[in-house]
């Protein structure tokens, strides 16, 4: 049985000075089997302040996960740079074997990170959504 990525989650965190009521986290989750993406904004208390679900065409989901499986295997676990810019990102990928790969960073993209952003932004555009997520926060 081939081990496939079944779920991709990207969290962006604002680690700067802010009030607990401020939006300090964005979470994007893309599900392979359900053909959908869930976008959430959370405040400093961890309370979901907004949530949007976007349905994605099956062929686009397949293309996205095939791309991840081809490129993310060589990722290191840490792309943090010793810079205080006040933000951090974390990617988690769940596999059909129940393995979870976790990768984190700050001001630099992981390899092919810009292409991942392009896929996600196309899902948002195709879903006619107005959300503008930070994603990796590197742009």
What are the language-model segments listed below?
Residues 1-20, 46-139:
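Short, well-ordered, aromatic-rich surface patches in folded extracellular/luminal domains
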């Amino acid at each position: 049985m081939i081990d496939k990525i079944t779920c991709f989650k990207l969290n962006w965190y604002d680690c700067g000075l802010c009030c607990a009521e401020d939006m300090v986290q964005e979470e994007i989750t893309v599900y392979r089997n359900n053909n959908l993406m869930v976008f959430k904004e959370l405040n400093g208390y961890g309370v979901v302040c907004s949530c949007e679900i976007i349905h994605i065409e099956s062929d686009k989901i397949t293309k996205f996960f095939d791309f991840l499986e081809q490129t993310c295997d060589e990722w290191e676990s840490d792309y943090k740079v010793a810079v205080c810019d006040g933000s951090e990102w974390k990617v988690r990928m769940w596999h059909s074997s129940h393995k979870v790969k976790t990768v984190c960073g700050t001001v630099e993209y992981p390899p092919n990170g810009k292409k991942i952003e392009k896929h996600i932004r196309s899902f948002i555009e195709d879903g006619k959504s107005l959300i503008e997520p930070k994603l990796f926060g590197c742009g």
